[in-house]
């Protein structure tokens, strides 16, 4: 967690929360204002976890169409096609950065994927992908869900553990 600079109580608390979350395999939602280090938090979480020696893959959801996101995550079924992050990241972590920008149809697909993963973890079967999902956002997903712009079921699946990055304005000494 050396990349997360700062000695304020807020940063010390965040580092401790990351260490605790690293031992838990649930999906993590990282929230914070732009520039507050949500990607660094996700990377630090991965490096502290038992998945540290496995891939850490990042998808910036704001940069891709639904079709590209689908291809990047699930891959191409053809023999010589792109395997997709779910296969490439086996045993590791996938960061869904700017998850608030995902279109509603793909949100449904993500919710189904996370439901499958959660069920297999609870049953101890690991039938679904052996991936830890981390989502990051600068938006209030609860508000977006109330406005009908973000699926409630996806929000529930993403909020297994929530980490809040302290705003830069409250850690001016850092």
Q: Which residue ranges define each predicted feature?
A:
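AAA+ ATPase active-site-proximal loops
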Residues: 1-145, 158, 162, 166-172
């Amino acid at each position: 967690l050396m990349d997360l600079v700062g000695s304020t109580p807020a940063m010390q608390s965040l580092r401790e929360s990351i260490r605790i979350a690293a031992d838990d395999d649930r999906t993590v939602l990282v929230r914070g204002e732009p520039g507050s280090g949500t990607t660094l938090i996700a990377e630090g979480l991965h490096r502290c976890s038992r998945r540290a020696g496995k891939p850490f893959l990042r998808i910036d959801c704001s940069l891709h169409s639904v079709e590209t996101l689908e291809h990047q995550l699930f891959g191409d079924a053809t023999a010589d096609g792109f395997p997709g992050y779910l296969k490439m990241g086996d045993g590791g972590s996938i960061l869904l950065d700017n998850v608030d920008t995902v279109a509603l149809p793909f949100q449904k697909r993500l919710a189904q994927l996370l439901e499958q993963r959660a069920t297999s973890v609870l049953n101890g079967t690991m039938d679904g992908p052996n991936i830890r999902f981390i989502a990051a956002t600068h938006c209030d997903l609860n508000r977006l869900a109330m406005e009908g712009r973000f699926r409630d079921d996806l929000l529930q699946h993403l909020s297994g553990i929530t980490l809040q990055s302290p705003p830069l304005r409250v850690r001016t000494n850092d």
